[in-house]
Amino acid sequence: MPPVDNAYKLRNQEYLQEYAQKPGVKIMFNGVMYREISKGSGPKPSPKSFVTVHYVGKLINGKIFDQTQKGRPATFRLNELITGWITAMREMPAGSRWEVVIPYNLGYGSRPAGAIKAFSTLIFDITLLDVR
């Protein structure tokens, strides 16, 4: 395993502290944070639900590491996603759009995952289109 980049880890922790102070931010029981961009009125998913979403995933420097293609949403079984997504999506009514901020321990953790460095805070813009 590569050595820990303590400066990067600290920047990610500072980002979480700053984000928590923004107006409209809600902090969930395990540290996942979100800001409601638009409110939906559909059902909330259960862990075994299939969710159809549009999303953009970014790091704290603004670099996009993953996203759905325009006009082509993605469908996932909720309980197969990272813990931070599961936590947020369980409270998100279909039709909603949220900005979700996930601490590293509820994302990809202390190990790198592709272009995502260890200890990365993940920022997602998620629109929940459908729950089945």
Language-model segments: residues:
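Cross-family detector of peptidyl-prolyl cis-trans isomerase
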Residues: 1-132
